[in-house]
């Protein structure tokens, strides 16, 4: 389906409503543009990415935000999940076409196919939704994800978080970042890592001025922010070589708090195949492991351009196992 056909068929919503569905305060952070039903449990979502810059083939933050926003849009607009409920992302594993690259210097349009495979609880306001998500550009699938969204009521969430629920937003110190080029990012404002106390070890840097990572006040570090920090740690580990990640799996063990240091460590894993590399990144807070991310893909010298192509095929199976909060 062409972009023009999709846009013509999309069930458009006012920008403020799309922002609410995506749990975002700032409309400029909203990537989803509308949706339409294509089957009993299948939907097509329109997505617009801003212009890409830098030496990475795509912005990992836009990829993960696309998955998140598309799933939330379907959950709220179609399945009527209450906006007052807290979202818990139980699983998020994805693969990316090895040669996918966002066009440099110009916005790009994507189609996102969301298939809801199973629903637990009441269908119209279910406690969980299992989704398969395909990102499509020019009719070709360039990324696939499998995820499960869960929701809990405000009352239950208050019980879970206790006295951590209220927090003086932005009151923590923000240390100076590592060099942006070390992480493959375009500017210091995008860097989520600060120098650590040893090699391959960094301090998580929670800069609330980065709206793509911190759109609005929350009581714990968002899971996608931790995933972004892990990607940057993998880039720093390989620098000046760049990791073009094609498979990512993440496990979250506990909430990461703002008022305690969180240490990020990266290490090489055995290569899964000739020409490929794998990295494991762990986050530790108060002496306990808080999350773990494994990234696999191709290392490319000096951020060489990766031409577009190579669709994700059915053989590129996603690996279950992510628990993200």
What is the meaning of each model-derived region?
Residues 7, 37-86, 200-236:
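Hot-dog-fold acyl-thioester-processing enzymes
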């Amino acid at each position: 389906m062409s972009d023009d056909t999709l846009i013509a068929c999309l069930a458009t919503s006012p920008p403020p409503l799309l922002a609410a569905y995506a749990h975002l305060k700032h409309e400029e952070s909203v990537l989803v543009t509308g949706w339409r039903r294509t089957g009993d449990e299948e939907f097509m979502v329109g997505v617009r990415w801003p212009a890409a810059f830098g030496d990475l083939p795509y912005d990992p933050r836009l990829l993960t935000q696309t998955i998140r926003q598309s799933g939330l849009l379907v959950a709220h607009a179609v399945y009527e999940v209450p906006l007052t409920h807290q979202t818990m992302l139980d699983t998020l594993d994805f693969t990316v076409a090895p040669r996918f690259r966002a066009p440099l210097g110009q916005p790009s349009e994507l189609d996102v196919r969301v298939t809801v495979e199973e629903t637990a609880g009441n269908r119209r306001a279910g406690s969980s939704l299992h989704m398969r998500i395909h990102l499509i550009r020019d009719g070709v699938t360039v990324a696939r994800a499998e995820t499960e969204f869960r929701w809990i009521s405000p009352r239950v969430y208050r019980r879970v978080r206790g006295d951590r629920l209220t927090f003086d937003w932005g009151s923590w110190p923000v240390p100076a970042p590592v060099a942006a080029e070390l992480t493959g990012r375009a500017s210091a404002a995008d860097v989520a890592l600060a120098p650590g106390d040893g090699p391959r070890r960094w301090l998580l840097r929670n800069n609330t001025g980065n709206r793509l990572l911190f759109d609005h006040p929350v009581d714990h570090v968002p899971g996608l922010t931790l995933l972004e920090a892990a990607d940057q740690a993998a880039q720093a580990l390989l620098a000046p070589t760049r990791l073009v990640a094609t498979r990512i799996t993440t496990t979250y063990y506990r909430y990461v708090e703002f008022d305690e240091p969180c240490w990020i460590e990266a290490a090489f894993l055995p290569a899964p195949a000739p020409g490929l590399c794998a990295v494991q990144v762990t986050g530790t807070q108060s002496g306990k492991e808080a999350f773990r991310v494994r990234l696999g893909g191709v290392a490319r010298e000096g951020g060489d351009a990766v031409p577009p192509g190579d669709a994700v095929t059915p053989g590129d199976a996603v690996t279950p196992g992510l628990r993200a909060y």
